[in-house]
Regions:
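Rossmann-like dinucleotide-binding core of oxidoreductases
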Residues: 13, 21-157, 191-192, 269-296
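Short, conserved catalytic or adaptor-binding loops enriched in Gly and charged residues
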Residues: 34-39, 183-188, 257-259
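Conserved beta-strand-loop-beta-strand element in the redox core of flavoprotein oxidoreductases
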Residues: 1-13, 41-46, 197-214, 219
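Short beta-strand to alpha-helix junction loop
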Residues: 1, 63, 135-144, 169-181
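Short, surface-exposed acidic
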Residues: 154-167
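Short hydrophobic core segments
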Residues: 12-26, 60-63, 83, 198, ...
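Helical element adjacent to the flavin cofactor pocket in flavoenzyme catalytic cores
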Residues: 7-9, 13, 173-204
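Glycine/threonine-rich phosphate-binding loop and adjacent beta-strand/alpha-helix elements that clamp
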Residues: 218, 222-295
Length: 296
């Protein structure tokens, strides 16, 4: 065809190639729960944080115990008076082993950039070694599960709470989470773990599937993102329809980057580019190099 024609608020553009670097986790998933929109207090998704809300001294409800929740719950426990955590399905969690680099290490990296490159390579290799435990290797999965169980046992002494936080599915079936401080936060006396889904909302009362009722002042939805239906896909029209229509039966591409029927379109962090065992930054860098080589 004649290339790509783009319509923007500042006018129309034409280009021979189009690179979509729109990100993947951009559209929050909001559950369809009776009464949710009528919640009596501040209500927001973790990706649309309302910084005007005062959390100090508040009773905070959090819906979800996935990747978003393990990042925000520890801080909410530090700030709020009480946190009620509604968990539909627990996740396997392994140590993140996060730490700050020392001043000496920073000086060494500054003096020898190759040392930083070697460290990055080592971290990549460590991530790749984790793939077997997520891809059906029974021995690797069993070893990883034992590590996750040991992590849980070391940080959660209460047997009943441990049981509630233990998944009933095989390691690797769902996204494995990394956290050093989520379990300690959940063991706090300022946290109530409700091991059932949110069924409905009545004013400021959260009604769980178990029938339990919890009063909260603020409600945070840590309910994830719509990652399989990208909003930009509805705006991109190729030879035979929109990208959303092309992907209606499932997102497919070559090398996670180029899509049949959409000439000179490149999608960064495209289908199957996101990883559960290593850094997506590495994937995006490889895609960017592929785009540059293709257009050179």
């Amino acid at each position: 065809g004649d290339g790509w024609r783009l319509r923007t608020p500042r006018g129309d553009l034409e280009a021979q190639a189009l690179v979509l670097a729109c990100g993947r986790l951009t559209e929050p998933t909001v559950p369809d729960i009776p009464g949710l929109e009528g919640f009596a207090g501040p209500l927001f998704h973790s990706a649309r944080w309302d910084h005007s809300v005062k959390l100090a001294g508040a009773r905070i409800g959090v819906v979800g115990t996935g990747a978003s929740a393990v990042q925000i719950v520890p801080e909410l426990v530090r700030r709020g008076a009480h946190v009620t955590l509604l968990q539909r399905t627990p996740a396997w969690i392994v140590p993140r082993e996060a730490r700050d680099y020392t001043d000496a290490e920073r000086r060494a990296f500054a003096a020898d950039p190759d040392a930083l490159a070697r460290l990055r390579s080592e971290l990549f290799d460590e991530g790749e070694a984790r793939f077997a435990s997520r891809s059906g290797d029974p021995d690797a999965a069993a070893d990883a599960r034992r590590r996750a169980e040991a992590h849980l046992a070391a940080q959660v002494p209460d047997a009943a709470l441990r049981a509630a936080l233990t998944p009933d599915y095989a390691f690797g079936c769902k996204r494995v989470l990394l956290s050093d401080d989520f379990y300690p936060a959940v063991t706090s006396s300022a946290v109530t773990l409700e091991a059932s889904a949110l069924a409905s909302v009545e004013g400021s009362t959260l009604v769980a599937a178990s029938g339990a009722r919890h009063e909260v002042d603020v409600l945070v939805l840590a309910t994830g993102f719509s990652s399989s239906q990208q909003p930009y896909a509805h705006l991109v029209r190729g030879e035979e329809g929109t990208l959303a229509e092309h992907w209606s039966g499932g997102m497919t591409s070559f090398a996670s980057t180029v899509v049949a029927g959409f000439p000179n379109l490149f999608v960064l962090d495209g289908p199957n580019a996101s990883l559960g065992h290593n850094s997506s930054i590495l994937m995006i860098e490889e895609q960017a190099e592929y785009v540059v080589r293709s257009l050179a």
